[in-house]
Each structure stands twice: as structure tokens, then as C-alpha cells.
């Protein structure tokens, strides 16, 4: 069933129909289309298009259809309807006869699909917020269990300064907190109802759109009909949110892939999230993490594709805008799946504390401590920086750690160095000194964990 046809003297070519139809993907909007239709039926009562009895009959039929859809959403795909709006109307007419043909009075598919998609986005945001929060909780739990796991921190993938595995977990917790905030901001902007804007110029019936918005669960109604049916900012924003969130998860995955490697061996992943090789029996591959990293690209691609689709469109609705759904559906599904999988990875992770500490003690990660020591003795920092660089070269030549160099050797570089330098160069001292807010000292990490728990409460 098509919702148009009187203007045409020939049937659509079957190849065009397959190219044009969107039911194969927009069937996912079925529940939202039904909910929007129930709201619209109530609005039509207020302008005397429907009687109370007719509206109740329509609502009853739509609710029955909603139950069917919730039980088996993929049954919709058996239809040859053009889109989800056509399918709902066709099924409604089957249930209530000609009364079903009155429902679309004053409504266009342009404001209808905009409403459906926003309602769907609101549902998805609620689910994503829950998934993000669950992963934040998993990171905090993992951090709390690994406050004493000292490991190298890196810049340029070179050992830089010692940190803890807990501090690393909390870094990703902060990224996810921003992801959550972005989703909440996106929701504020999209929470306005398009219904009642018609094709582009507004409906010809004196509908109270604010009342209608309330019935549908929106905060308010949109203010300009032309903008409303043209607007897909919320799609771009959600794709941007997903893209940034997936970048965070991809970096999380890359870190753990390295930490899990034989070269680092800081962690071991659970058998539940790894796989083997068909040839090499010793292999335990971090497939879950590699897939998280790999799937990041498809989400970025969806955002780029949507921006390119919209960039040259004149106002108002154009069929190009049908391309807003497949990329969005896939991107949000992917983000949700990756959030879940990241949490599963954390559930079974084992941190190898001795190996982490051994690595943290290598690579001259305490060099900055020696420079700070010299500054405390009155040496200008830039000069201290140069002195320590020379001392590191000597330590490398001798094949020793800085703290293993004899005092006499250290004093060759600066006479102010004394026996009190050795406690300063100890690994625990390196951590303890980073006691400013956000630092890696045990006290600050414990405080950050407590703060994160309060924010999640």
C-alpha cells in the first residue's frame, strides 16, 4: 500500500520501488510511529476531526498493533509496504476499516518521521546513558581493586613516569563521564516535538502543539515548521556523541592490547573475551578489544556520511534525508555493543603486579624526581634538566638504574647531590609526590575513587 498515487497513471517500476522503499530499516520505528499516531488521534479530537468514540476505537486498535509489534517486530518485514508509516496505516485500516483513513488528516510523513526518529533517539539515549554508567562503574570497581598496582605511564609510547593501574582506569572513567554529559546535552536539544508541522508550512488545523508535545513526552514543541522538517541536527549530534565515545573505547582497547602483549605483559585477559589461532596453538588473541578498536571506524564513517548528505540540501524535506537512519541505527548499536564488551573485558582482567612494578622501575621514569631534587637544592630547572640528562646517559652506559649509581658518580654531574637523593628516587616516592588534585599519589587516587562513587550514586 502506498500513501500516494492519484497523481500517477503508471505503477512504479519494481526496481525503483526496491530502491525507494525504506521499510527494511525504518521498521525499527514501529513503536514510535504507533505512539505518535495515538497522540495525533487525540489532537484530532480537539479540532473535531474525530469524535471521542472514534479516537478510542483508533487508540484501541493502535495499542493492539503495538502489542503485536513488541512481540515480533520483524514480522513487519514480510510486508511490501513502502515504509513504516504505510505499514502502520495499512494494518490500522485492516483493523478498523475506513476510520483508519481519517488518522492522517492534517499530518505529513515529513513531521511524522521526524517525530518517530526523535522518539526513538530519546529511547536510545536512555539506554546508552545506562550502558555508559555501567562501564564507568566497572572502571571504578577495577580501580579500587588495583590501587597498589604500580606501572609505567607513557608519552610517545615511551616510559615516562610511574602511575598506577587504578589511575589509568580513572582516566577512562573521566572520558566516559564526558560521554554521558554529551548525551544529556543532546537530549535537551532534541526534546522538542515536530508533530503538527505538516509537510513544511505547518498543519492547517488549530492543533495545540504544546499540549500534543506533552502527550508524546516531549518537553515542548518546535518553533518553526520549515526548520522542523528539515532538521537532523539531533542525528548529527548523536553520531558525534557516538564517534567521540567510540574513540575513547578504541583508545581503551589499544592500551589494553599493548598491556596484554608479550612485550608488556602487564595484564592477562580472560578466556571469555579472547580467541585462539587455527594454526598456532599457543596464541590467545585479544579479539574483543581488537573489534572494539576496529568498529570505531564504522561509527566515524556514519557521522561523516551524514554530514555530507546534509551539507547541500535546500529547505525543506528531501528524499536524501531517508539516509539518516541506517547509519544512525548501526552507529548506536555498535556503540552500545562496544560499551557492553568493554565492561566484560574488565570483569575478568588480571593485573600482573610484579611485572608492572618491574617495568615501572625501568626506563629511568624517576628522572623528573632527580631534576626536582636539584631544583630544591637551588639549581635552576633548565640546568637541572640538562644535568639529569647527562646522568641518564651515564646510567645507560653502566647498565644501571639511576638509583643504582654510586653517589660519587652522581656527584660528577652536580656537587649538590647527597645521600638524601636515594629515597627521592624510590618508586613509591615518585608516586607520593604527585599529591595535587588529579595526581597519582595513593591519597589522591583514593580520593578520586571516592569522588567517582559519589558521582555515580
Curated annotation (Swiss-Prot):
Pathway: Amino-acid biosynthesis; L-arginine biosynthesis; L-arginine from L-ornithine and carbamoyl phosphate: step 3/3. SUPFAM superfamilies: L-aspartase-like. Signal peptide: none annotated. One of its GO terms (cellular component) is cytosol. One of its GO terms (molecular function) is argininosuccinate lyase activity. One of its GO terms (biological process) is arginine biosynthetic process via ornithine. Gene3D superfamilies: Fumarase/aspartase (C-terminal domain), Fumarase/aspartase (Central domain), Fumarase/aspartase (N-terminal domain). It catalyses: 2-(N(omega)-L-arginino)succinate = fumarate + L-arginine. It comes from the Bacteria. Its EC number is 4.3.2.1. It is found in: Cytoplasm. InterPro entries: Arg_succ_lyase_C (IPR029419), Argininosuccinate_lyase (IPR009049), Fumarase/histidase_N (IPR024083), Fumarate_lyase_CS (IPR020557), Fumarate_lyase_fam (IPR000362), Fumarate_lyase_N (IPR022761), L-Aspartase-like (IPR008948). Its main location: cytoplasm. Pfam families: ASL_C2, Lyase_1. Keywords: Amino-acid biosynthesis, Arginine biosynthesis, Cytoplasm, Lyase. Belongs to the lyase 1 family. Argininosuccinate lyase subfamily. This is Argininosuccinate lyase. The lineage of its organism: Bacteria, Pseudomonadati, Pseudomonadota, Gammaproteobacteria, Enterobacterales.
